[in-house]
Each structure stands twice: as C-alpha cells, then as structure tokens.
Amino acid sequence: NRIRVSGSFDTPVFSTALYHQSTFNDLFVKGLSVTAGLRLEYEKMSMNYFSDSNIDFDFFLKMAMPPLNIPFRNLNAAPLLEGKEKNDYVQLLPKLAFKYDFSPANNMYVSITRGYRSGGYNVQMFSELIQSDMQQKMIEAILDKAPESMAGMIEGMIKQHMPNYGKELNVQETTVYKPEYSWNYEVGSHLSLFNGKLKTDLAAFYMDTHDQQIAKFVNSGLGRMMVNAGSSESYGVEASFLASINKNLNMNVSYGYTHSTFKKYDGGTTSSEEQIDYSGNYVPFVPRHTMNAGANYSFFFDKSNWMQSLTLGMSYTGAGKIYWTEKNNVSQSFYGTLNGRISLQTKALQIDVWGRNLTNKDYTTFYFETMHRGFEQKSRPLQLGVDIRYHF
C-alpha cells in the first residue's frame, strides 16, 4: 500500500551588502602597498512549510502470556507540519593585505581575510519529521481507542521500544544549519626569473573555520543533509613553477600539501547512548597531497604551410590521501593518472587527439555510507578521444 505525503516549501532569501576597498601604494617605502577592505552583509532567509498525510489502519495487540489478542480497528492518523522559520545574519568581513614589489615582476605578500558561507534549510529532513509525526499520531490513535485499564500498559511497552516517543518535534533544530565562518591567513610570493623564462608562485596558508558545514546522509539513508561540525583548522603550502625553456618547449610543476583536521566536532551519540567525538580527525574529502607535472613541445611551420603547428603534450596528475568519512575509517591512498594530447592547428581547423588515464589506474573518486552500507564511485578507465574545432 502507498501512503500519500504532500509537501510545499518556500525558501526565499534576501541579501544586501556594502563593500569598500582601498589600496595605498608606496606606503612608507617605495614598492610597499597596503590594501584594506570591509564588507558589511545582511542576509535574511525564511522557510514556509506545509507537509501532511493521512492513513487509515488497524492495530492488533497480541501477547503470548497471558494469552491476548485485541483488535483496534478503523483507526486514523493525520500528521501535519505547518509553519514558518525565520533567520537573519549580519556579517562584517574584513580584509587586510600587504604587498611588496621588489621589482616590476616580483613581489611578496601577506593577507588576512574573513570568509563566510551562507546557512540554509535542510528541506529534505521533512520526510524524517513527517514520519516521526505519523508514528506519534498513530500511537495516539491506538491509546485513544484502548480501554483505560490497558492504556498505561500499552504506553509503557511503546516507550520501552521507542525511547523518542512523546518528544516534541523541533523543526528548527532539525532543518536549520548555520553559516560557516573562517579566518584565512596567507603569505606568499610571485616571482618571474631568468627574464621571464621561469615563473613561480609560492604560498603558505592557515585557515581557522568555525561552524564548518559538512554534508552527511540522514538516518534513513534517503537524502543528504548539511550539518555544522564545530570547528576545524587547515594549514599547508602550495608551489607552482612554469618554465618556458624556448619557444618550442614549456614545462610546469605544481604541488600542494594540506593538513585539515577537526578541532571540535561532536558527532552525537550512538544507539547505546555513547558520545561520538571526531575531534582530531581529518576533514573528509580534502586531499593531503595534490600535484601536477606536464610538458608541451610545439613544432611551428611556415605560415604558407597548411599546417601551422603541431603540439605534443604529456601530464601527470595526482592526489591523496583522501579520507571519505568523519570516522577516518575509509580512505583513498595517493594515486596518479597519466594523460597525453596531440594537437594539430591549421588556419581554421584544430584537431586534438587525447588520452586520459593512460595507465588505466583504478581508484575511488567518491564514497558515501547509507543504511549501514558503503558505496563508492570508481574512476573512469583509459579513455581516448578526438576533439575537432573549426573557426569561421
């Protein structure tokens, strides 16, 4: 049998902001610039919700000792959730950056910014709420129909097997997730060396995040929800190098390291009422290492030739280790893929022959758990293809 559940949700968002940024050049010494900015943002959001259902059912109370078989027929439960949630937030997001140009193409910088990510509503949680309300209404219908002498016994049995029975549904607590805030600190340098033949970007960063938003599956496994996971910190380094050896050959290498962990994350309780604490665990879906290395060699031909250029390119891309869960019990180790491309350019036509994952590397690109089972999305195997572009 099917049970009809209706739902109507309206989630308007209004936001407005004032922003100012000023840069002061050659402050105190030549080449030193200071940038200061401030963003004032107001965001107002609301959710008008209506969800209801209706079910006719029969209930049979059966016991072996003493022998008991009492039918409760023609019962009805009509769960209803209707109302409005309103939330508004005011943010001050400052920015301060120092940059020193020690030559026209080389500089060092330090920046401090405050980041913000909007909150919202987990509308999909209403499927859980309406189910809970339906259970409550069905139990109330049974108790209303039961003889007064048996109502207490039945209610006691229900509470024994359903500890959440009688608890008031809290729509706001269940559906609302708060904004995420972060303080971001970065120091780095942009360098152009050997007459521009080598360009380098170097950076080190630290992020202090509060009310971090994490996506997770709901208890029923039917849908995902956003939750605020306490606080986390991330720090790391990034480096990239682009070398133009000559007009034919260029090479690039980049590397990033990120250490991202929860400082505080209360994961609730288990079925046995044990506290779950993920503090100190790695933040899921954040690769510890990322890297890329590539080279392109181009052959250039006379403009009178029908073929203007032919470029051969190879690249290697890697990432890992990546944790998939807050428990840190499932992960993907470091992996890398080899890719290649041959590009033919004429005056009006470009033909690219490419290959991805040339070594047919097997790895996991995504993982999630629902209904006590784990599911993973595997990588794409070796791929070959051709792209054709015609310019007119």
Annotate each PLM feature:
Residues 28, 197-210, 225-325, 389-391:
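Gram-negative outer-membrane beta-barrel transporters
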Residues 10-18, 38-48, 88-94, 112-116, ...:
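Transmembrane beta-barrel architecture of outer-membrane proteins
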Residues 20-26, 90, 98-102, 114, ...:
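Residue-level signature of outer-membrane beta-barrel architecture
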Residues 116, 315-325, 343-392:
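C-terminal beta-signal and adjacent terminal beta-strands/loops
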Residues 1-103, 121, 163-170:
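Signature of Gram-negative outer-membrane beta-barrel scaffolds
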Residues 2-9, 21, 78-85, 171-176, ...:
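Extracellular loop and loop/strand-boundary signature of outer-membrane beta-barrel proteins
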Residues 107-111, 130-227, 233-235, 256:
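Membrane-embedded beta-barrel scaffold of Gram-negative outer-membrane proteins
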Residues 29-34, 105-108, 195-200, 248-251, ...:
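Repeated loop/turn-to-beta-strand initiation elements of outer-membrane beta-barrel proteins
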